[in-house]
Amino acid sequence: MTSTTDKAGQPKSETPEWEIKAAKQSRLAFGLAVAELARRDEKVAAISADTIDLFGLRPFLEASPERLIEAGIAEQNAMGIAAGMATTGMRPIICGYAPFITTRSLEQLRNDVAYANQRVVIGAACGGIVLAMAGGTHHAVEDLAIMRNMPNMTVIVPADARQTWHAAMATEQLDGPCYIRLGGKFDEPDVTELDADFRIGRADQLRNGDDITVIACGALVAPAVATSQALAHDGIGVRVLNMHTIKPLDRDAVLAAAVETGAIVTAEEHRVTGGLGGAVAELLATEQPTPMRMIGMPDEFAIVGPPAQVREHYAMGEGAITDACRDLMR
């Protein structure tokens, strides 16, 4: 008899590996995971905030139209619907835009989902400044700070499409709400392996190093790895932690890095206040004071322009990470 579980005892995926690897964009990998979760559990339903095509949900809509609700450009309604469904034992998964699902529906998110500790998963596409050309209304550079301050909320920022798949599938283990920040309509470099172990709340050490540590999440993980590779040629060992879970933070990994390498650089496509940098700084300030630099957006609204130009303007990339590492090494 053919086994229906994998080595870890989890149900085997019906989604072909090639399809996950071909996704290349975290929003599409999340959509594939939604369909897979729905195949495993009839209580899973998707709620779209005018994002069916953004998340690649059309095949799911055609296969299970009764389990996909189109709320339209009405994030407050989407969040309220999800909270209501969760109270009946359903497992709603919201698919929305990061800048809107975290601000427009904040009251419902806080009171109906987080306060009530409802089992609602929020997939938030276009996090950071991937929609920078659309102006300040479409920048999502405070979403992690908002979500970190919601009791009961798990906050995940996958490094690539492959890790997004694992993050979404891992929400089966959660009994409360979860926010997963995703990218936009750009291919994302692969920095993780599809067969890599993924655990909520446990950082991935992508590069070894004893001189300094870069702790990064999301879009800045790849530049962090590139920095480590470049500085290795100069004899500088840069440890790279992919801190995919912002909350709960992997305290052990952060504190070990502080003790073993003596200096920390954080890197995120988010304001330096309240996100990954803030979480790491709060921990180090109370447990292990350590020299530190934070790469991210300053306390201002971002300029408008192509994402690459905005990243360069605010020094959110490999060059800035490298400079911060060298500065701390002096």
What label would you give each PLM region?
Residues 1-181, 186, 197, 318, ...:
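Thiamine diphosphate
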